[in-house]
Amino acid sequence: MPELQLRGGEVDGLRLHYVVEGRGPAVILVHGLGGFAETWRHNIEPLARRATVYAVDLPGFGASAKPRSRYRLANFASALRGFMDGLGLAQASLVGHSLGGAVSVTYALTHPSRVERLALVGAVVPGCSFRPSWAFRAVAIRGLGEIASSFAWAGLYKACLARCFHLPDRAEIDFFVDYRYADRTEPEARAAYLSTLRDVRIDMETHAHDYRRAMTTLELPMLLIHGRQDRVVPASHCDEVAALVSHASVRRVDACGHFPQIEHAEAVNGWLVDFLVGRPAPR
Protein backbone atom coordinates (compact mmCIF):
# COMPACT_ATOMS: atom_id res chain seq x y z
CA MET A 1 0.00 0.00 0.00
CA PRO A 2 1.69 3.26 -1.10
CA GLU A 3 2.34 6.08 1.33
CA LEU A 4 2.51 9.79 0.56
CA GLN A 5 4.03 12.42 2.84
CA LEU A 6 2.27 15.74 2.30
CA ARG A 7 4.10 19.03 1.96
CA GLY A 8 3.14 22.61 2.71
CA GLY A 9 0.80 24.45 5.05
CA GLU A 10 -1.03 22.78 7.90
CA VAL A 11 -0.65 19.31 6.36
CA ASP A 12 3.15 19.45 6.05
CA GLY A 13 4.63 16.10 7.05
CA LEU A 14 1.28 14.30 7.27
CA ARG A 15 1.50 10.69 6.01
CA LEU A 16 -1.41 9.29 4.03
CA HIS A 17 -1.74 5.69 2.87
CA TYR A 18 -3.70 4.90 -0.25
CA VAL A 19 -4.54 2.27 -2.85
CA VAL A 20 -4.08 3.03 -6.55
CA GLU A 21 -5.18 1.00 -9.56
CA GLY A 22 -5.93 1.53 -13.25
CA ARG A 23 -5.17 4.12 -15.92
CA GLY A 24 -7.22 7.04 -17.14
CA PRO A 25 -8.94 10.08 -15.56
CA ALA A 26 -8.24 10.47 -11.85
CA VAL A 27 -10.93 9.34 -9.41
CA ILE A 28 -10.48 9.63 -5.65
CA LEU A 29 -12.60 7.48 -3.33
CA VAL A 30 -13.15 9.03 0.11
CA HIS A 31 -14.37 6.72 2.89
CA GLY A 32 -16.66 7.58 5.78
CA LEU A 33 -16.33 7.68 9.56
CA GLY A 34 -14.54 4.59 10.82
CA GLY A 35 -13.76 3.51 7.27
CA PHE A 36 -10.53 3.02 5.34
CA ALA A 37 -9.40 2.66 1.73
CA GLU A 38 -10.18 -1.05 1.46
CA THR A 39 -13.85 -0.51 2.28
CA TRP A 40 -14.06 0.31 -1.45
CA ARG A 41 -12.68 -3.11 -2.39
CA HIS A 42 -15.87 -4.05 -4.29
CA ASN A 43 -15.59 -0.92 -6.42
CA ILE A 44 -11.93 -0.24 -7.17
CA GLU A 45 -11.36 -2.84 -9.88
CA PRO A 46 -14.51 -2.09 -11.93
CA LEU A 47 -13.77 1.65 -11.83
CA ALA A 48 -10.09 1.06 -12.63
CA ARG A 49 -11.02 -0.37 -16.04
CA ARG A 50 -11.71 3.19 -17.17
CA ALA A 51 -9.92 5.43 -14.65
CA THR A 52 -6.95 5.79 -12.33
CA VAL A 53 -8.56 5.08 -8.98
CA TYR A 54 -7.11 6.31 -5.71
CA ALA A 55 -8.70 5.10 -2.47
CA VAL A 56 -7.20 7.10 0.38
CA ASP A 57 -7.08 6.58 4.14
CA LEU A 58 -8.11 9.93 5.57
CA PRO A 59 -6.00 11.38 8.40
CA GLY A 60 -6.81 9.54 11.61
CA PHE A 61 -8.08 6.42 9.86
CA GLY A 62 -6.75 3.20 8.36
CA ALA A 63 -2.97 3.19 8.10
CA SER A 64 -2.62 6.96 7.70
CA ALA A 65 -1.07 9.16 10.37
CA LYS A 66 -3.24 9.97 13.38
CA PRO A 67 -2.03 13.33 14.63
CA ARG A 68 -3.24 14.99 17.81
CA SER A 69 -4.97 17.80 15.97
CA ARG A 70 -8.37 19.01 14.85
CA TYR A 71 -10.51 16.80 12.66
CA ARG A 72 -12.82 19.43 11.20
CA LEU A 73 -14.12 19.14 7.65
CA ALA A 74 -11.74 21.92 6.59
CA ASN A 75 -8.81 19.89 7.95
CA PHE A 76 -9.84 16.82 5.95
CA ALA A 77 -10.28 18.99 2.84
CA SER A 78 -6.78 20.40 3.33
CA ALA A 79 -5.41 16.86 3.50
CA LEU A 80 -7.23 16.04 0.27
CA ARG A 81 -5.67 19.08 -1.38
CA GLY A 82 -2.24 18.03 -0.17
CA PHE A 83 -2.87 14.51 -1.44
CA MET A 84 -3.70 15.79 -4.93
CA ASP A 85 -0.75 18.17 -4.88
CA GLY A 86 1.61 15.40 -3.83
CA LEU A 87 0.43 13.17 -6.67
CA GLY A 88 0.56 15.99 -9.20
CA LEU A 89 -3.19 15.84 -9.86
CA ALA A 90 -4.49 19.16 -11.14
CA GLN A 91 -8.04 17.83 -11.22
CA ALA A 92 -9.94 14.70 -10.15
CA SER A 93 -13.44 13.39 -9.69
CA LEU A 94 -14.42 12.61 -6.12
CA VAL A 95 -16.60 9.81 -4.79
CA GLY A 96 -17.46 10.28 -1.12
CA HIS A 97 -19.30 7.92 1.19
CA SER A 98 -21.06 9.13 4.36
CA LEU A 99 -18.63 11.50 6.13
CA GLY A 100 -16.44 11.24 3.03
CA GLY A 101 -19.29 12.94 1.18
CA ALA A 102 -19.11 15.90 3.55
CA VAL A 103 -15.34 16.03 3.05
CA SER A 104 -15.74 15.87 -0.73
CA VAL A 105 -18.40 18.60 -0.73
CA THR A 106 -16.19 20.80 1.44
CA TYR A 107 -13.29 20.31 -0.96
CA ALA A 108 -15.47 21.00 -4.00
CA LEU A 109 -16.73 24.23 -2.42
CA THR A 110 -13.25 25.45 -1.50
CA HIS A 111 -11.41 24.16 -4.61
CA PRO A 112 -14.06 24.07 -7.36
CA SER A 113 -11.58 24.20 -10.24
CA ARG A 114 -9.92 20.99 -9.04
CA VAL A 115 -13.04 18.81 -8.95
CA GLU A 116 -14.32 17.51 -12.27
CA ARG A 117 -17.30 15.49 -11.03
CA LEU A 118 -18.74 14.69 -7.63
CA ALA A 119 -20.52 11.48 -6.60
CA LEU A 120 -22.02 11.16 -3.13
CA VAL A 121 -22.91 7.70 -1.81
CA GLY A 122 -25.01 7.54 1.35
CA ALA A 123 -23.49 10.92 2.08
CA VAL A 124 -24.13 13.36 4.87
CA VAL A 125 -23.92 17.02 3.83
CA PRO A 126 -23.84 19.90 6.33
CA GLY A 127 -26.86 22.16 6.01
CA CYS A 128 -29.30 19.35 5.31
CA SER A 129 -31.34 17.85 8.14
CA PHE A 130 -29.50 15.06 9.92
CA ARG A 131 -29.66 13.68 13.45
CA PRO A 132 -27.03 11.12 14.47
CA SER A 133 -28.21 7.99 16.24
CA TRP A 134 -28.27 7.89 20.04
CA ALA A 135 -25.16 5.69 19.99
CA PHE A 136 -23.14 8.25 18.04
CA ARG A 137 -24.42 11.06 20.25
CA ALA A 138 -23.51 9.12 23.38
CA VAL A 139 -20.01 8.25 22.19
CA ALA A 140 -19.45 11.91 21.28
CA ILE A 141 -19.85 12.89 24.94
CA ARG A 142 -16.43 13.59 26.41
CA GLY A 143 -15.45 10.97 28.92
CA LEU A 144 -18.21 8.55 27.98
CA GLY A 145 -16.71 8.02 24.54
CA GLU A 146 -13.28 7.36 26.02
CA ILE A 147 -14.68 4.79 28.46
CA ALA A 148 -16.70 3.01 25.79
CA SER A 149 -13.78 2.92 23.35
CA SER A 150 -11.41 1.54 25.98
CA PHE A 151 -13.54 -1.36 27.15
CA ALA A 152 -15.85 -2.31 24.29
CA TRP A 153 -14.40 -0.96 21.05
CA ALA A 154 -14.91 -4.03 18.85
CA GLY A 155 -18.40 -4.70 20.20
CA LEU A 156 -19.43 -1.07 19.81
CA TYR A 157 -18.04 -0.98 16.29
CA LYS A 158 -19.91 -4.16 15.33
CA ALA A 159 -23.18 -2.83 16.75
CA CYS A 160 -22.86 0.40 14.77
CA LEU A 161 -21.96 -1.51 11.60
CA ALA A 162 -24.94 -3.83 11.91
CA ARG A 163 -27.19 -0.78 11.86
CA CYS A 164 -25.54 0.36 8.64
CA PHE A 165 -26.69 -2.60 6.55
CA HIS A 166 -30.27 -3.27 5.45
CA LEU A 167 -29.63 -6.97 6.02
CA PRO A 168 -26.57 -7.34 8.27
CA ASP A 169 -23.81 -9.26 6.51
CA ARG A 170 -21.56 -11.03 9.02
CA ALA A 171 -18.69 -11.41 6.53
CA GLU A 172 -18.70 -7.69 5.71
CA ILE A 173 -18.98 -6.68 9.35
CA ASP A 174 -16.13 -9.00 10.33
CA PHE A 175 -13.99 -7.54 7.53
CA PHE A 176 -14.59 -4.00 8.79
CA VAL A 177 -13.70 -4.99 12.33
CA ASP A 178 -10.75 -7.30 11.62
CA TYR A 179 -8.90 -5.61 8.73
CA ARG A 180 -5.73 -3.92 10.02
CA TYR A 181 -7.26 -4.23 13.48
CA ALA A 182 -4.12 -3.04 15.28
CA ASP A 183 -3.90 0.14 13.17
CA ARG A 184 -7.50 1.05 13.89
CA THR A 185 -7.72 0.20 17.58
CA GLU A 186 -4.53 1.76 18.89
CA PRO A 187 -5.12 4.67 21.31
CA GLU A 188 -4.31 7.24 18.62
CA ALA A 189 -6.94 5.74 16.30
CA ARG A 190 -9.63 5.77 18.98
CA ALA A 191 -8.76 9.36 19.86
CA ALA A 192 -8.96 10.40 16.19
CA TYR A 193 -12.35 8.71 15.80
CA LEU A 194 -13.79 10.50 18.82
CA SER A 195 -12.25 13.82 17.78
CA THR A 196 -13.80 13.45 14.33
CA LEU A 197 -17.24 12.79 15.82
CA ARG A 198 -16.99 15.88 17.99
CA ASP A 199 -15.32 18.24 15.53
CA VAL A 200 -17.57 17.41 12.58
CA ARG A 201 -20.61 17.86 14.80
CA ILE A 202 -19.47 21.44 15.32
CA ASP A 203 -19.32 21.93 11.55
CA MET A 204 -22.76 20.38 11.10
CA GLU A 205 -24.32 22.61 13.75
CA THR A 206 -22.53 25.93 13.35
CA HIS A 207 -22.03 26.12 9.58
CA ALA A 208 -25.29 24.65 8.31
CA HIS A 209 -26.51 27.92 6.80
CA ASP A 210 -23.16 28.59 5.11
CA TYR A 211 -23.17 25.15 3.50
CA ARG A 212 -26.78 25.45 2.29
CA ARG A 213 -26.01 28.77 0.66
CA ALA A 214 -22.73 27.56 -0.85
CA MET A 215 -24.26 24.35 -2.21
CA THR A 216 -26.51 26.38 -4.50
CA THR A 217 -23.40 27.74 -6.23
CA LEU A 218 -21.95 24.34 -7.18
CA GLU A 219 -21.89 24.00 -10.96
CA LEU A 220 -20.13 20.67 -11.37
CA PRO A 221 -21.99 17.48 -12.36
CA MET A 222 -23.18 15.55 -9.30
CA LEU A 223 -24.49 12.03 -8.77
CA LEU A 224 -26.31 11.09 -5.57
CA ILE A 225 -26.69 7.41 -4.67
CA HIS A 226 -28.69 6.53 -1.57
CA GLY A 227 -30.25 3.45 0.00
CA ARG A 228 -33.96 3.72 0.65
CA GLN A 229 -33.54 1.87 3.96
CA ASP A 230 -30.54 3.89 5.18
CA ARG A 231 -30.92 4.18 8.97
CA VAL A 232 -27.77 6.27 9.41
CA VAL A 233 -28.42 9.05 6.89
CA PRO A 234 -32.11 8.91 5.88
CA ALA A 235 -33.02 9.00 2.19
CA SER A 236 -34.81 12.31 2.79
CA HIS A 237 -31.37 13.84 3.39
CA CYS A 238 -30.41 12.93 -0.18
CA ASP A 239 -33.57 14.63 -1.45
CA GLU A 240 -32.61 17.83 0.38
CA VAL A 241 -29.15 17.81 -1.19
CA ALA A 242 -30.61 17.26 -4.66
CA ALA A 243 -32.95 20.23 -4.18
CA LEU A 244 -30.02 22.55 -3.48
CA VAL A 245 -27.97 21.86 -6.62
CA SER A 246 -28.87 22.27 -10.26
CA HIS A 247 -26.77 19.50 -11.82
CA ALA A 248 -27.64 16.48 -9.66
CA SER A 249 -28.82 13.06 -10.77
CA VAL A 250 -30.27 10.76 -8.10
CA ARG A 251 -30.19 6.97 -7.89
CA ARG A 252 -32.25 5.48 -5.05
CA VAL A 253 -31.47 1.88 -4.17
CA ASP A 254 -34.16 -0.49 -2.90
CA ALA A 255 -33.47 -2.99 -0.11
CA CYS A 256 -30.33 -1.04 0.77
CA GLY A 257 -28.94 0.57 3.89
CA HIS A 258 -26.00 2.90 4.39
CA PHE A 259 -23.52 1.04 2.14
CA PRO A 260 -24.91 0.96 -1.42
CA GLN A 261 -21.39 0.42 -2.78
CA ILE A 262 -21.22 -2.84 -0.80
CA GLU A 263 -24.83 -4.01 -0.63
CA HIS A 264 -25.51 -3.40 -4.33
CA ALA A 265 -21.98 -3.11 -5.70
CA GLU A 266 -22.73 -4.17 -9.27
CA ALA A 267 -25.45 -1.56 -9.81
CA VAL A 268 -23.48 1.17 -8.06
CA ASN A 269 -20.32 0.41 -10.04
CA GLY A 270 -22.26 0.71 -13.27
CA TRP A 271 -23.72 4.07 -12.29
CA LEU A 272 -20.35 5.38 -11.11
CA VAL A 273 -18.45 4.31 -14.22
CA ASP A 274 -21.10 5.74 -16.50
CA PHE A 275 -21.16 9.02 -14.55
CA LEU A 276 -17.40 9.39 -14.12
CA VAL A 277 -16.20 8.44 -17.60
CA GLY A 278 -19.35 8.53 -19.69
CA ARG A 279 -19.69 4.90 -20.72
CA PRO A 280 -20.34 1.59 -18.98
CA ALA A 281 -17.52 -0.71 -17.97
CA PRO A 282 -17.04 -3.89 -20.01
CA ARG A 283 -18.65 -7.08 -18.73
List each language-model region with its residue ranges:
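Acidic catalytic loop of the alpha/beta-hydrolase fold
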Residues: 229-233
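Conserved HGGG/HGGXW glycine-rich cap/lid loop of the alpha/beta-hydrolase fold
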Residues: 14-63
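Short beta-strand/loop motif that positions the catalytic acidic residue
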Residues: 218, 224-226
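Active-site loop/oxyanion-hole signature of alpha/beta-hydrolase fold enzymes
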Residues: 11, 19-21, 54-99, 131, ...
